[in-house]
């Protein structure tokens, strides 16, 4: 056979698994992953969420057993979300400031049992309000400054309970500065802030709202969440949050916004966390359950793409599976 006179043959670097692994530009490790946990009052609870196959609502006793298993295979960080009964919700989300609510007790118990874990608490009102909005909803509007004051109180409470990092997800103006000042005044100078800096008004949040029963009852979240068409606005939000005292910024969703992740990494000196949201996860799971694609392959590829775009860490509902694959050196790439 006559060979073509090719000086460059890039395929030489792909001819074996050993070579491909040696020169790989992006790798996944267990410390890249943050596991989101839905906590619910009660005991013995492990309820699968229909719109999120493989994701569960947990009571504190059952999550402790699962965390024990996952810590043995490399889990380093979790972020907590509360599932609140309707009778404990009101217009103002007052139960969010109660020191015995499920997220406060979750922070305490998880830090006590697993002190090595980084525990991140989501700072939001939508699980606690009857409106389902991320702030105080009044006269068809989410009130910015009044909501920010409440978030300062909630963040300080979570810091007191032992949260390593608080994560305000509301997209209210000025909330990072207020939370930082409030926590510092109360002596929690070492509690970090992971700000949801660019939280887009996405159609991909539906399964998450199913999990928390927090669908907005009226009004429009586009009044405060970002327009999916905008990227410069996201960079402005990242810079503002850095100036206000954030320790990390977040881009949410992740997979549809890889360009934003890349540009955010270039515009800030802070770590950039990306959230692979419920809709992204559920699309992959639905297709895999129909046999249309490989669950392992699609999840791994999606997370690799997010990290390749520049994410420092990734919040993903697939974290338990990925930890298992990493522990067995069984990632499909």
From Swiss-Prot:
Pfam families: ALAD. It catalyses: 2 5-aminolevulinate = porphobilinogen + 2 H2O + H(+). The active site is at 199 (schiff-base intermediate with substrate), 252 (schiff-base intermediate with substrate). GO terms for biological process: protoporphyrinogen IX biosynthetic process. 5-aminolevulinate 2 binds at residues 278, 317. Gene3D superfamilies: Aldolase class I. The keyword Metal-binding applies. One of its GO terms (molecular function) is zinc ion binding. One of its GO terms (cellular component) is cytosol. Pathway: Porphyrin-containing compound metabolism; protoporphyrin-IX biosynthesis; coproporphyrinogen-III from 5-aminolevulinate: step 1/4. Mg(2+) binds at residue 237. Its EC number is 4.2.1.24. Keywords: Heme biosynthesis, Lyase, Magnesium, Metal-binding, Porphyrin biosynthesis. PANTHER family: DELTA-AMINOLEVULINIC ACID DEHYDRATASE (PTHR11458:SF0). NCBIfam families: PRK09283.1 (NF006762). Homooctamer. Belongs to the ALAD family. This is Delta-aminolevulinic acid dehydratase. It comes from Chlamydia muridarum (strain MoPn / Nigg).
């Amino acid at each position: 056979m006559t060979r073509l006179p090719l000086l460059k043959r890039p395929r030489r670097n792909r001819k074996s698994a050993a070579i491909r692994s040696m020169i790989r530009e992006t790798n996944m490790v267990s410390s890249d992953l943050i596991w989101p946990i839905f906590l619910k009052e009660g005991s013995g609870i492990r309820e699968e969420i229909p719109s999120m196959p493989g994701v569960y609502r947990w009571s504190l006793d059952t999550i402790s057993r699962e965390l024990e298993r996952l810590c043995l295979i490399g889990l380093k960080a979790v972020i907590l979300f509360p599932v609140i009964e309707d009778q404990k919700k009101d217009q103002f989300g007052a139960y969010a400031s109660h020191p015995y609510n499920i997220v406060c007790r979750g922070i305490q118990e998880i830090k006590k049992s697993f002190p090595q874990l980084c525990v991140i608490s989501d700072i939001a009102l939508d699980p606690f309000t009857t409106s389902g909005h991320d702030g105080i909803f009044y006269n068809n509007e989410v009130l910015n400054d009044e909501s920010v004051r409440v978030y300062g109180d909630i963040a300080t409470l979570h810091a007191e309970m032992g949260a390593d990092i608080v994560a305000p997800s509301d997209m209210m103006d000025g909330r990072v500065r207020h939370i930082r000042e409030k926590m510092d005044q109360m002596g929690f100078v070492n509690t970090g802030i992971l700000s949801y800096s660019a939280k887009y008004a996405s159609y991909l949040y539906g399964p998450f709202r199913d999990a928390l029963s927090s669908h907005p009852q009226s009004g429009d979240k586009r009044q405060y969440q970002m327009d999916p068409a905008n990227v410069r606005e996201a960079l402005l939000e990242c810079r503002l949050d850095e100036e206000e005292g954030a320790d990390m910024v977040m881009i949410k969703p992740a997979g549809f916004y890889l360009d934003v992740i890349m540009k955010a990494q270039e515009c800030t000196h802070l770590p950039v966390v990306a959230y692979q949201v419920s809709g992204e996860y559920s699309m992959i799971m639905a297709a895999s359950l129909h046999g249309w694609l490989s669950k392992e392959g699609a999840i791994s590829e999606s997370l690799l793409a997010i990290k390749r775009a520049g994410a420092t860490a990734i919040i993903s509902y697939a974290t338990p599976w990925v930890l298992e694959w990493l522990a067995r050196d069984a990632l499909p790439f």
